[in-house]
Regions:
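Acidic, divalent-metal-coordinating active-site segment for phosphoryl/phosphodiester hydrolysis
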Residues: 186-193
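Conserved CoA-thioester-binding segment of acyl-CoA-metabolizing enzymes
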Residues: 1-62, 280
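CoA-thioester-processing core
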Residues: 109-116, 124, 130-183, 197, ...
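C-terminal long alpha-helix characteristic of the crotonase
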Residues: 27, 144-149, 200-246, 253-254, ...
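Structural motif
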Residues: 101, 124-125
Length: 280
């Protein structure tokens, strides 16, 4: 199905039997998020909101991973702090787009749009769900993962915070101490551990197959009742979202391009321990 303004080498959409099958389609890059992917996901989510006949959405990634996070080339831009020019002509992200809110708004949108869609969204996770990838998955209503999936709130390694709605979605799923530990350390957890702590709903050897089966079960129920149930569950989260997302933007604005943030990225590429400066 053709989505206006969306390149099919980033996201594909098919609709069958009430199930909207959305797939990140950049397998050669582990479905990493570049500017085209950001815009494609946002446009796809908005398109589905008004697409007739949709009862359930299944979100997955082609190839070896669900989503490995922000495109690797973009971190080279972060190492120098970037500028306030938005997206570069070559398609790489400019850190200025982050610091001045443009990308941050869009980055939040590609995760939260799945909550704005009035029908259930199921994410099928395999391979990697790192950084922006895990925050994208957290925007779904239900997550089914392979036991060996590698998940991480990875932003701390780049000297930043999870600013793609993750502070809200993590806090609603996990105990505060567990959520904080994952953010403070950026450690990688398996699908098994993610299931044990409540980050993942179910484990499956074939997450996409199980997600489709669950979607078919949901699609067989009264669609009005299903939509009503999602609305009721999401009412409180929606009232909290605006303030929390504004706070995320405020913090990322302060961090991006700062000396310590640039040092975190530079040290990663130099394969050395970072040397940070403590504020007095």
């Amino acid at each position: 199905m053709k989505i206006p303004g969306v390149s099919e080498d980033r996201v594909t959409l098919t609709l069958k039997d009430g199930i909207a099958d959305v797939r990140l389609n950049r397998a050669d890059k582990r479905n990493a998020l570049d500017s085209l992917m950001f815009h494609a996901l946002a446009a796809t989510g908005d398109f589905i909101k008004t697409l007739p006949g949709v009862r359930v959405v299944v979100l997955s990634g082609e190839g070896a991973s669900f989503c490995a996070g922000l495109d690797f080339a973009s971190f080279h831009v972060m190492a120098s702090g970037g500028s306030a020019t938005g997206f570069k002509k070559n398609g790489q992200l400019d850190a200025g787009a982050l610091t001045h809110g443009g990308l941050t708004h869009l980055a939040q949108q590609i995760c939260w749009v799945w909550q704005e869609i009035p029908v259930p969204v199921i994410a099928a996770l395999h391979g990697h769900a790192l950084g922006g990838g895990i925050q994208l998955a957290l925007g779904s209503d239900i997550r089914i993962a392979h036991p060996d999936t590698q998940l991480s709130v990875r932003e701390i390694y780049w000297g930043i915070v999870p600013d793609m709605t993750g502070t809200l979605t993590l806090s609603r799923l996990l105990r505060p101490d567990i959520a904080k530990e994952l953010v403070f350390t950026g450690r990688i957890i398996s699908g098994r551990e993610a299931h044990e702590i409540g980050l993942v709903t179910h484990l499956a050897d074939d997450p996409l197959n199980d997600a489709m089966a669950l979607a078919a079960t949901i699609a067989a129920h009264n669609p009005d009742a299903v939509r009503g149930a999602k609305y009721l569950f999401n009412r409180q989260a929606s009232t909290e979202a605006a303030g929390q997302f504004a706070a995320e933007r405020e913090v990322i604005f302060a961090l991006m391009g700062s000396d310590n943030q640039k040092e975190a990225v530079a040290a990663h590429f130099d394969q050395r321990a970072p040397v940070f400066i403590d504020k007095t």
